[in-house]
């Protein structure tokens, strides 16, 4: 692959929304320079420990090698880089050497809130992150099932961020527990990273029937109960023994499928508006 020479041609990096320097750190992996590979990866990606587990690997869809064979296994390589970094101390806490004296409040500790906190802290600002839930992570913590993203991975990174000087305040609902005017007095800047909390609903006969749940509510209750009591507190919606219908075939819908199956659902049917993908390549393709 061209990655082995560190070259970037055609659309080799266009698939990554973060514009990761994929050929560069793939070349460094190829030559065994793992610490340099981590440094190049971390230059554009604050959280490779998350993306290497849950990212849909758009980089592999854009990989030039995929035109005539299999694409480079970029996500697996990324996972190897970050876990090697943890194992060898490359990902150890690195507090900023100089503080600016500026104070920033970030509302929300999901992916965008954590990324903003990390970037601003690296620049020497004093950062405090407010989270309404009882744990840091937003949808990373409660919207993605533990089977897909083990929550110890999130805690590992958050603990490093704490050692680097970032403050986290959980169980604090801005607007209720503290007024925006108070934040403006305490901080030089306030950044809103609240996420999209309003689910997409449908208009259909029987929509108000019992037993219908929004996906994130279903997933959140299950993960909370798992973390708090290993599913012994009964504070979650159980699909055990039930015939389950899931509307939506995206990542969240698939997470609901996996959760329902693990809970022991009698049957699971998934509805998707898009046409079913082909099971084999067409003769003229």
Q: What spans do the regions from the language model cover?
A:
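Residue-level signal for mature regions of secreted extracellular proteins and peptides
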Residues: 3-5, 9, 48, 56
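Detector for the c-type heme attachment site
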Residues: 4-8, 21-22, 60, 64-68
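Ferredoxin-type iron-sulfur electron-transfer modules in oxidoreductases and energy-metabolism complexes
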Residues: 11-14, 18-53, 68-98, 223
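Residue-level signal for short amphipathic helical patches enriched in basic/charged
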Residues: 32, 58, 263
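Hydrophobic or amphipathic alpha-helical targeting/insertion segments
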Residues: 56-68, 186-193
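Residues forming the flavin
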Residues: 78-285
